[in-house]
Amino acid sequence: MRRAVCPGSFDPITNGHLDIIARASSLYDEVYVAVMINQAKKGLFEIEERIDLIRRVTAEYGNVRVESFHGLLVDFCKQREIPAIVKGLRAVSDFDYELQMAQMNNGLSGVETLFIPTNPTYSFLSSSLVKEVATWGGDVAHLVPPLVLEALTERLRNR
């Protein structure tokens, strides 16, 4: 079985993330979405909320599993016998950082990284940008799934 992982914080998941997950889903038999736990950062959504949102918006893909992870991504991969990491690249600036990470991960464990160019529609998109625009009342409906927009609107209203 061909397995891959799409890692990230997904706070919140965006249409850009979903595009990469969907494309990975068509290339691999099983795709894990690994939601990073970073105790140093207080996210807008708790880990459990992110996992729930991702599970709901990826439900149409029968080969996508969503789990959290803490620590090194290569350890997550080793525990689940995942030989490949799938990363979306928005711009050259992403490549510089992601290449270093790919080389480190490969050196640590032999896991390979597959880079997928982001759909040009989402080349500017990040979770941070979505949160910033939404915080100031901007329209992000075209940047996140409706379910996520609803959760984001509710969360910002209650802040």
UniProtKB/Swiss-Prot annotation:
InterPro entries xref list: Cyt_trans-like (IPR004821), PPAT (IPR001980), Rossmann-like_a/b/a_fold (IPR014729)
GO molecular function, one term: pantetheine-phosphate adenylyltransferase activity
Catalytic activity: (R)-4'-phosphopantetheine + ATP + H(+) = 3'-dephospho-CoA + diphosphate
Keyword line: ATP-binding, Coenzyme A biosynthesis, Cytoplasm, Magnesium, Nucleotide-binding, Nucleotidyltransferase, Transferase
Example of a GO biological process term: coenzyme A biosynthetic process
GO cellular component labels: cytoplasm
Site, as annotated: Transition state stabilizer: 17
Residues binding substrate, per UniProt: 9, 41, 73, 87
Compartments it resides in: Cytoplasm
Assembly notes: Homohexamer.
Function: Reversibly transfers an adenylyl group from ATP to 4'-phosphopantetheine, yielding dephospho-CoA (dPCoA) and pyrophosphate.
UniProt cross-references to HAMAP family, sorted A to Z: PPAT_bact
Protein name: Phosphopantetheine adenylyltransferase
Classification lineage: Bacteria, Bacillati, Actinomycetota, Actinomycetes, Kitasatosporales
